[in-house]
Amino acid sequence: YAPNMMELASRDVVSRSEQTEIDEGRGIDGCVLLDCRHLGEQVIREKLSQILEIARDFAGVDIRKEPIPIQPGMHYQMGGIKTDINGLTAVPGLYAAGECACVSVHGGNRLGANSLLDTLVFGRRSGEHASDQVKKKSFASVTDASADSDLANIRRLLKNDDAGEMFGRVRQELGQTMDKHLAVYRNQQGMEEALAKVRELKERYRQVRVQDKGKTFNTNLIFTLELGFMLDCAE
């Protein structure tokens, strides 16, 4: 895949190479293997100490003795919230800047360093434009209706039938769908299948149960609410 650059190939080339191997059946349990054993224990301890710890803690793998199962991971999705060149969205007064925004400069491929334009150039433009505009605008108070709507959604989740499925299953299926159809390789058919699946998951999400009914630092509720936002973003 990169006979000249070898292990120094760009993340773009490496990601496509890994996914091609997996898709064509040469992977192992949905991964390819990264072997560091030839470097020797001393080099691994001195120069790859963080990777040594992460592989041990999260994958249960000792990279001094066995290869690491790897696969392409989502850093961030190229093409986010649609904005103009000043970071202004379709919602008056709402800006999006940096890696969450899409100014339509780049395509869908996440190449090294192209986030600098998003963050440094358009991030600054957004800040300057927002600073200028805020001097000309008055601010409205948050309406009771907006707060009531959010509270009603929280109460609905807390009251859902305990027989409903847990948020983790829906979240896992969402991740698998996005990884399969909207990651390294994309086509129209796959994206249409993903959209249909996301809409199915949104319907199932309405019946998701929150096991912890507490109202203080309820992480179960927080993760469930986050899943709703993830489904909206995915759609």
Segments (PLM) and residue ranges:
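An anion/pyrophosphate-binding glycine-rich loop and adjacent beta-alpha core
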Residues: Y1-D62, E66, H129-K135, R171
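An active-site-proximal "capping" alpha-helix that borders the catalytic cofactor pocket
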Residues: S115-Q133
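Short beta-alpha connecting loops at secondary-structure transitions
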Residues: A2-N4, V105-L116, N153-K159, D179-A183
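Long, amphipathic alpha-helical stalk/connector segments used for oligomerization, subunit docking
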Residues: D132-K215
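C-terminal amphipathic alpha-helical interaction region
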Residues: R204-E235
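Short FAD-binding loop at a beta-strand-to-alpha-helix junction that anchors the flavin cofactor
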Residues: L88-R110
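FAD/FMN-dependent oxidoreductases across multiple families
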Residues: S49-Y95
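Short, glycine-/Ser/Thr-/acidic-enriched flexible segments
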Residues: L39-E41, H75, N86-L88, A101-V103
